[in-house]
Design a protein with these regions (language model features):
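Glycine-/small-residue-rich active-site loops that bind phosphorylated ligands and cofactors
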Residues: 63, 142, 284
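Loop-rich catalytic cores of soluble enzymes, especially ATP-dependent carboxylate-amine ligases
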Residues: 83, 94-271
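Terminal accessory/anchoring regions of large secretory-pathway or extracellular enzymes
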Residues: 13-14, 23, 247-256, 261, ...
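Short aromatic/hydrophobic contact patches that present stacked aromatics
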Residues: 55, 136-138, 277
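Terminal catalytic/cofactor-binding subdomain
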Residues: 1-123, 131, 280, 288, ...
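Short, intrinsically disordered, mixed-charge
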Residues: 22, 80, 156-159, 163, ...
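Short helix/loop capping segments that flank catalytic or ligand/cofactor-binding pockets
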Residues: 6, 64-66, 147-149, 162, ...
Length: 301
């Protein structure tokens, strides 16, 4: 019927997760409604993006051949489920058919807060959450000097990678002459936390400058007593240096986990965590999924 897989039902994400559990995956996180929203296996995980897009996060591996093998094994699992249920797997950077209002948001507190905040800072944030799909690659670094070299180079090359891997020319059933609707969507999502920042292109960049940048970005939420509390009125710097007016936030002591969560809500084209994450490519067909980490491996190492 040309519709996305629903979150729950006889043929759904929940049903797919049960199928994957039979293939050796273990149950992971549950939402507030006791519904399964992630799986894990041998250091890898399967999670859900806001519009039920599947995300495989592979385990740490030594080379791109191992990464490709792991990816193909998972894709074959999905393909088997798809054939059993007359489904089609689409490898594109943007949903070619569905309208935004037709897509179901998964019930997850973090995504609820983002859903309410996105329209305040851009016109396409909800499209980003529900209609985009990407291939990303993560790389280690030896020390700060090595990190800076890789980070700056990766930022400088991102426009080239975006062009090479552009693969989303269709929107709502028609070709709209935009080679990557995914990139077009990101350009008006949230300029504060997205894109390529000027300071990221300079060889004088260092970790302190990235921290300064991240501190200025609005914080989506704090998890207090098991609940996600909306903090989008505050940057992380505000939470550290000012006294919030809300009683539950004011009485809460920030932790390292809050900072780590905050870093995960920064959506620049190259993201810095305990590893380097390159994020500029559209999703594509199977061989292109492996091509992206191979491309970056040849450049960064």
């Amino acid at each position: 019927d040309k519709k996305r897989l629903k979150f729950d039902g006889s043929i759904s994400i929940q049903n797919l997760f049960q199928f994957l559990i039979e293939k050796g995956w273990q149950k992971g996180e549950y939402n507030a409604f006791n519904q399964l929203i992630s799986l894990s296996k041998n250091g890898a995980s399967v999670t859900l993006e806001p519009g039920c897009q599947l995300e495989l996060s592979g385990k740490i591996l030594k080379n791109v051949h191992q990464t490709c093998t792991e990816t193909y094994e998972h894709l074959h699992e999905l393909q088997e489920y798809a054939k059993l249920n007359n489904l089609c797997i689409i490898g594109l950077g943007f949903d070619p058919i569905s309208k935004r209002e037709d897509i179901e948001f998964i019930p997850k507190d973090r995504y609820r807060i983002m859903r309410e905040y996105m329209p305040k800072v851009g016109s396409r944030g909800l499209d980003m959450m529900t209609r985009t799909c990407t291939v990303q690659a993560n790389f280690d670094y030896f020390d700060e000097k090595d990190l800076i070299k890789k980070f700056v180079l990766a930022n400088r090359l991102q426009p080239l990678v975006m062009a090479l891997f552009s693969n989303s020319p269709f929107k709502e059933g028609s070709h709209n002459l935009i080679k990557s609707n995914r990139i077009h969507t990101w350009q008006d999502t949230d300029s504060e936390r997205c894109g390529i920042k000027k300071e990221f292109l300079d060889q004088s960049f260092n970790i302190e400058k990235y921290v300064d940048f991240a501190l200025k970005v609005k914080n989506y939420f704090l998890k207090i007593n098991g609940k996600h509390i909306d903090t989008t009125s505050y940057s992380f710097h505000d939470l550290v240096t000012k006294t919030p007016k809300e009683k539950n936030i004011k009485e809460y002591n920030l932790t390292v986990s809050d900072w780590i969560n905050h870093l995960s809500t920064i959506f620049t084209e190259v993201r810095l965590k305990s590893y380097l994450e390159v994020r500029g490519a559209d999703a594509g067909k199977w061989e292109m999924i492996c091509a992206l980490p191979a491309f970056w491996t040849g450049i960064l190492y």
